[in-house]
């Protein structure tokens, strides 16, 4: 006789399945590293292709050529525009103070018609409370006050405030702003690292390394309102069932006299905040090009990536799929819980990259 019980359909781990608060994903946990570097980067999802590579992981195919799907994320340089200090509060970390750089002219703005475009002019599209009459003298004064707080030991954590530059990828004008933790053993070396980077661009090759494992944080592709069959995976009812088949046969007992939250119901599907762990970074490219077998090749396939176009900036190649729609902001950090049998830290040997049209 077969079993009369089974696991429930659909996981309750992510309930309530509602839309993310922001399209810019948040990162709450950071790896503990002794190397002084910014713990992560951000880019825009361009599309997918596939490569042939020599498998270097333990297994039956080690040393053989295997087929691997890859995702291309365009990663224009990030602008480090500020530093935020945290102190120990009653309920955890609290913001002690923050210092941002004064306004400056953007030399790399791609438009020929827009002259004298400043960083604040684009940043104020995202932050409405930028300071007025903020001079270099005021900036140096605030930076000195923050350095005094660091020396006294009142500051327990420092984060780098960065802004993306989507105009370099011809995606949009409004930047995304976010903060990143910095690795290191002391608060002083973290402060010196961010202080040196203030007002400067930081490239993905300075932060990430080929072959390392990353955690990908993004907002998934939205599907709108969907029924319980697609949203939760419940089985269709019998063909003799009345009033439809793509429904839940019973939504609960008479008492308690309400529908419980565990019952699979129709509602929002997709546009959820998700983190995927331990994605391998295969390659880092510069200016849309990659070195393969001793020659530079463009990563953009024939006809461009669908719904994206041509990759012209730095980019990263990640093994497998990642959440998010095309052109969506993708954040990444070094893996916080790498597997015990992790692949080699070096980049694998790639023998072929597909540049066939994806149209």
From Swiss-Prot:
Coiled coil: none annotated. Residues 336-359 are annotated as: Disordered. GO terms for cellular component: cytosolic large ribosomal subunit. GO terms for molecular function: rRNA binding; structural constituent of ribosome. Disulfide bonds: none annotated. InterPro entries: L3_arc_euk (IPR045077), Ribosomal_L3_dom_3_arc_sf (IPR044892), Ribosomal_uL3 (IPR000597), Ribosomal_uL3_arc (IPR019928), Ribosomal_uL3_CS (IPR019926), Transl_B-barrel_sf (IPR009000). One of its GO terms (biological process) is translation. The keyword rRNA-binding applies. SUPFAM superfamilies: Translation proteins. Keywords: Ribonucleoprotein, Ribosomal protein, RNA-binding, rRNA-binding. Gene3D superfamilies: 3.30.1430.10, Ribosomal protein L3, domain 3, Translation factors. Part of the 50S ribosomal subunit. Forms a cluster with proteins L14 and L24e. Belongs to the universal ribosomal protein uL3 family. NCBIfam families: L3_arch, PRK04231.1. One of the primary rRNA binding proteins, it binds directly near the 3'-end of the 23S rRNA, where it nucleates assembly of the 50S subunit. This is Large ribosomal subunit protein uL3. It comes from Thermococcus sibiricus (strain DSM 12597 / MM 739).
